[in-house]
Amino acid sequence: MMQQYIEIKAAHADCLLFYRMGDFYELFFDDAEVASRALGITLTKRGKHRGEDIPMCGVPVHAADDYLQKLIALGHRVAVCEQMEDPAEAKKRGYKAVMRRDVVRLVTPGTITEEKLLDPSEANYLMALGRVKGSEELALAWIDISTGIFRVASTAPDRLLADISRIDPRELIVAEPVYHDAELRPVFDMLGRVVVPQPPVFFDSASAAMRLSRFYGVATLDGFGRFSRAELSAIAGAVAYVEKTQKAERPPLAAPERDEEGKSLFIDPSTRANLELARTLSSSREGSLLKAIDRTVTGAGSRLLAERLMSPLTDPQVIAERLDSVSFFLDEPGLRDRLRAFLKGVPDISRALSRLALNRGGPRDLGALSAGLEAAAAAADLLRGKEAPSEISAALSTLLSLPAALVSHLDRALADDLPLLKRDGGFVRGGYDAELDEMRALRDQSRRVIAGMERDLIEETGIRSLKIRHNNILGYYIEVRANNAGALNGTDEAKARFIHRQTMANAMRFTTTELADLETRIANAADRALAIELAVFERLVGEVVAASEPLRAAAQALAVLDVSAALACLAEGEDYCRPVVDGSLDFHIEGGRHPVVEQALRKQLGEPFVANDCDLSPAEGEKAGAIWLLTGPNMGGKSTFLRQNALIAVLAQMGSFVPARSARIGVVDRLFSRVGASDDLARGRSTFMVEMVETAAILNQAGERSLVILDEIGRGTATFDGLSIAWAAVEYLHEKNRCRALFATHFHEMTALTEKLSRLVNVTMRVKEFEGEVIFLHEVARGAADRSYGIQVARLAGLPQTVVERARDVLHRLEEGETGTKAARIVDDLPLFSAAMRQEPPKSKAPDHLREELTALNPDDMTPREALEVLYKLKRLVIEG
């Protein structure tokens, strides 16, 4: 047995091997040690190999999905090795014969289909990278085998990471030579364990057509459209990996669909991370934009919403069509609510279909399809006759074209209460199959039939204590007390009828030909009933898989309806407006709000969000958008203001209403954000280096249709260095990139740039000082700030009072120019607790005569009236100076 294990493991060295042993999957050697640590299960041993104990651990077959989920989440890949025969068959080949086993599938992060292993709200993409040898031409193909989605797009080295980040695959396969390519290696290093090298033959574009024709069972690929060599390489790699992992099974994949270049808003990886579109910087969905806007009621709808958010459009017409769909449901609240009530009960049609096609589905997957199709019919009835916009009309047309015969057949065939596993039976509705009903009656009514036979025998023999019983050894038998046995074996006639089976201390057991025949019929009835049900299951699955294309289309149509209705609910509940998205260079937001922060303020503090305008539209006579130079205090809301405008652009171009009173946005083709500070120590890059690399990427790529938000460029180095870099960056944005931009800074000297840069506008975050306290108004106004109020923020943060006072003193000296040029440079980079600068806090500036009066007072000896008189006297002294 161990030799068999070693041979199978050698063929799947990059996977943990789940080796079937009866009711367990067992792991040995290094696999056992890895799995025991990852799963928290006991590591034991079984036998020896080369004189050493063999480490072993195992998991029950019935709970395997739970353990697979943990391993996949940790990035492991698992080869599932099953027993291909039963022990009896193995013994026929000899008493020492080892049971045949083979790997039936590879479970990898990008190829899972089990409901337990998948997040219903997230797509699960496998991606392949194709490259033409000796060329810069690259392409990406991505598949979700759990839903059948298959897409392909061309890319280039400079935007490869951005395109991969947009799709966010769970697994990226690349040819081994590409994996070791020095130019692409940094990209793969950033992606980590997601990247899996595979044999180059998988990506052979020359044999791609033959591989695809075989996979789809077609003679020609003419109906698929034309693809470049790099695209064919990526497509072939993806299909080859699916064949490798799924073995004999084939998922119902759609034909590859090209994702046209320029169709989506370009957002680089750091911008996606900074804006926290789908996940926060801590990788949590909670607190992300997606979480804030998701009002969908189906898994497919949630996945489509995420896809649209991650790939906003750049075509104003298609954007308008999506907005029309949202407006339609906003204007039809009653229809919308009824539709959403239907959709709430819709199971995941695409994923159920995929499991059935891969022979991993059960009766409940058929039930999910049946329920989904019924909901689709109900949704179609709701929308029928309505004057709906084009996207909704197209969805309705798809739902109306569903195969009615399949819907009816599933409804007639499936029981209301379905078991999880088909081997349990009981999933075919009574009345569907006459023979099945007969077998079930015999199986289920066996007790009644046996009881009737027992009554007949009691009446015939006169033995009132006679019982017909059952055990696993004898089957059914007749039992009488020993003193009554003579009635059953006392005569030759009785002996011929009642066949002796067993003698007990106080009883004897018999059988009859009639009882044996009945037992055989009962046993056969159960087996026959299950066989009939399994045959019905296979027929139904065959019909479903044959109709996979219209079923997938219906699932997508329901997802479109869910997203449109959900965005209407969002717009109504959060008071969002419909944006105007056109081909201009405008960017005019009135009363804009941050969609995530607004909800958090309301939920946690019960406070409203302060709305602000933003106008980056070209001024009269200008051919390029404006740049707002934003100054103001720490904690004033600069970063929030920057992000909210970027998020409004993303929401508008994904086809959603936006958090504002009004919004007019000329299509943004590239969105860049440099907000926040982080380092990259693994690659030897400091916070400032990361900042400069990201800023360089923006300045090298932004064009006139870009929207750029930059926050505190240059803060990671010495003051004058940082100011110089920020100054030059603004000039470059203005003169070379000519893009719409928001640039926040604490370098107040930069406000003078508005005198020489015509499209630069000074704006500031308003504050109010009251009795020595700073009140942050979070309002954006025209003009420039002259202070950053950093010391006030430090005090609010809880810095020791001596530190705060010392900071005030240093600031006062710097502002008054008391220190020389050299000292000023030293202070610029001075550590907070430098011993050289440690001084006593500044003395109080209270007048001497006031101090004398206060010192002379003895509060313990004063009456209330005297104390009041002294208080008035002290007040006069202060007023008179």
Swiss-Prot record:
One of its GO terms (biological process) is mismatch repair. Keywords: ATP-binding, DNA damage, DNA repair, DNA-binding, Nucleotide-binding. Signal peptide: none annotated. GO terms for molecular function: ATP binding; ATP-dependent DNA damage sensor activity; damaged DNA binding; mismatched DNA binding. It holds the Pfam family MutS_III. PROSITE patterns: DNA_MISMATCH_REPAIR_2. ATP binds at residues 632-639. It comes from the Bacteria. The keyword Ubl conjugation does not apply. One of its GO terms (cellular component) is cytosol. Belongs to the DNA mismatch repair MutS family. NCBIfam families: mutS1, PRK05399.1. This protein is involved in the repair of mismatches in DNA. It is possible that it carries out the mismatch recognition step. This protein has a weak ATPase activity. This is DNA mismatch repair protein MutS.
